[in-house]
């Protein structure tokens, strides 16, 4: 569980460190930053890393978009994100 990522100071080093993690990561994000964060994750982790972006969990408008970081980022660039997000990102596979 990572919670919210650092906004400015320390964000790039934190993403670089997380890119090497073998565990599944859970990250919180606001609708205003979710597409940007997904793009940054794709750059740091590789665009083919799988993820799920879930919003409004246990509420009326619950939605979960699954795919690669690239696909999910493109989805939220084309469709305005609403609600609070939980990003679930797969860990690094064995090389």
Segments (PLM) and residue ranges:
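A contiguous loop/helix-start segment that scaffolds small-molecule binding in enzyme catalytic cores
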Residues: 23-95
């Amino acid at each position: 569980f990572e919670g919210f990522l650092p906004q400015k100071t320390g964000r790039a080093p934190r993403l670089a460190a997380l890119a090497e993690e073998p565990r599944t990561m859970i990250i919180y994000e606001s609708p205003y930053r979710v597409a940007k964060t997904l793009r940054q994750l794709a750059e740091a982790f590789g665009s083919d890393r799988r993820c799920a972006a879930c919003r409004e969990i246990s509420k009326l408008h619950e939605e979960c978009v699954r795919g690669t970081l690239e696909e999910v980022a493109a989805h939220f660039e084309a469709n305005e994100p609403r609600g609070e997000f939980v990003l679930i990102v797969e860990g690094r596979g064995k090389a």
